[in-house]
Amino acid sequence: MKKQRVVVKIGSSSLADSHGGISTEQLSDHVAALARLKEDGHEVVLITSGAVAAGFSALGYPSRPVTIKGKQAAAAVGQSLLMQAYTEEFRKYGIVTAQLLLTRSDFSRKEQYSNAYATLGELLNRSALPIINENDSISLEELTFGDNDMLSALVSGLVSADMLMIFTDVNGLYDKNPQKNADAKKYYFLPEVTEEISSLAGDAGSKLGTGGMKSKIDAAKTALSLGVSVFIGTGRGQEKFVNVLKGKGDGTYVGNAPQKEMKMNKQWIALHSLVSGQIEVDAGAATAIIQHGKSLLPAGVTNVSRFFQVGEVVEVVTQQGRVIGKGQCTYSAEELIDVKGMQSQDIQVRGERHSYEVIHRDHWVSL
C-alpha cells in the first residue's frame, strides 16, 4: 500500500467511559491503531474531542455541564489531562506528539491560516504526530461547531490529506435511525453527499458530544470539495485504521474517485475569508471568469459597493445580483471606482502596480 496522508477524527463518544470521563482503554486502543498507521509509513494527523469529557469530573460536576462557562471551565482543565494521556500512550511507540489548539478565527485570518499550514507541514516532515483540538476554553463557536467534525474536514483540506476518517459510536450512515428501526439500511459507499442524504441525518448529538450525524455528513461534503475522500464509522483493535485504508472499515465510505486538490490560498478564500466588499460585473466579464477561467479586468466592472482595501476579499455579482464567486482584490474600493469600465491600456499606472487585473484567476473561487 502506498504511503498516504491521513486525518483521523475521534469524537467524545469514542473516548468516554460509562461515567462520561475519558476511558483509558479506549484511548489506548485508538493510539495503538494510529501507531500502526505510522508503522506502515503513513503520515497521520489526529483531531480529537474530549477536553470537556476529560475535565468535568475533576471540577466536581456530576455530569457534562450544560452552561457555556461550565463547558469552557471543564475544557480548560480537561485539555491538559487529555494531551497528557495521549502523549504518554504515544511515547510507548516512540512517537513524538505536538499539540495545536485552533479556533475559527485562526482560519479566517490569512496570516494565522498560513502559519498553521506551515507548522503542520513541518511537523509531518519531522515525523511528528500533530494532535489538534478546538480551543474549547475560549471559543464559543466550538460548542456548536459539530464536535470537531467540520474542523477535521478543514484540516484535511489544509494538509492535502488522502483520506479523512471520522470515528464515532455508529458504524456508518443509515437511511433510518438503526437504534429505532430494525429495517434500517446501511450505506456502505456513497459517491457524493446529496441533499437527500443530508436530509436523512438529524441534528442531535450524543450525550457526551455535540456532533450528530448531520455534522459528519456536512464535514464529508466539505472534505470532498477539497479533494479528500472520507470514511465515517467505528472499529476496535490495532488494525482498525489500516483496515479503513484497505477498504475493510466498519462504516460508510464517501467518495473514492480522485478529486482535484484545491490550493491552500483558494481554500482560504472559499471557506474562511471574510468578505469586505462587493463588485458588480457585466455579462461578458461573468462569462470570461466562470466559463473561460479568466481574470477580472476593470473593463468588466460596472459597480463597486462598500469600502475595502487592497488585498481584501470581495464577492462578485452579476448585474442581476447573483453571486458568482469571490476573490482577493488588487485594487482598493476607491481606486476601483476611478477605473471601473476602463480598458487596461487607458488606465494610468499608479505607484508600483504591475498588473491591471482586479482579481487574478489564481486568487478567485467560483461559487
UniProtKB/Swiss-Prot annotation:
Enumerate the Gene Ontology biological process terms: L-proline biosynthetic process; proline biosynthetic process
Q: Where does substrate bind?
A: S49, D136, N148
Nucleotide-binding: is it a keyword of this entry?
A: yes
Which PROSITE patterns does the entry link to? GLUTAMATE_5_KINASE, PUA
Which species is this UniProt entry from? Bacillus cereus (strain ATCC 14579 / DSM 31 / CCUG 7414 / JCM 2152 / NBRC 15305 / NCIMB 9373 / NCTC 2599 / NRRL B-3711)
Q: What class of enzyme is it?
A: transferase
Domain PUA per the UniProt entry, residue ranges = 276-350
Entry similarity comment: Belongs to the glutamate 5-kinase family.
* UniProt-listed HAMAP family: ProB
Q: Under the GO molecular function aspect, what terms does this record hold?
A: ATP binding; glutamate 5-kinase activity; RNA binding
Gene name for this UniProt entry? proB
Q: Which UniProt keywords apply?
A: Amino-acid biosynthesis, ATP-binding, Cytoplasm, Kinase, Nucleotide-binding, Proline biosynthesis, Transferase
The cellular component terms of Gene Ontology attached to this UniProt record, alphabetical and capped at eight, are: cytosol
- UniProt cross-references to PANTHER family, sorted A to Z: GLUTAMATE 5-KINASE, ISOPENTENYL PHOSPHATE KINASE
Tell me the domain of life: Bacteria
Question: What is this enzyme's EC?
Answer: 2.7.2.11
Function as written in the Swiss-Prot or TrEMBL entry: Catalyzes the transfer of a phosphate group to glutamate to form L-glutamate 5-phosphate.
Residues annotated to bind ATP: K9, T168, D169, T210, G211, G212, M213, K214, S215, K216
The UniProt catalytic activity note for this protein reads: L-glutamate + ATP = L-glutamyl 5-phosphate + ADP
Kindly tell me the pathway this chain contributes to.
Amino-acid biosynthesis; L-proline biosynthesis; L-glutamate 5-semialdehyde from L-glutamate: step 1/2
Q: What is this protein called?
A: Glutamate 5-kinase
Instruction: List localization entries.
Output: Cytoplasm
Write down the SUPFAM superfamilies for this protein, in alphabetical order: Carbamate kinase-like, PUA domain-like
Instruction: Write down the InterPro entries for this protein, in alphabetical order.
Output: AceGlu_kinase-like_sf, Asp/Glu/Uridylate_kinase, G5K_ProB, Glu/AcGlu_kinase, Glu_5kinase, Glu_5kinase/COase_Synthase, Glutamate_5-kinase_CS, PUA
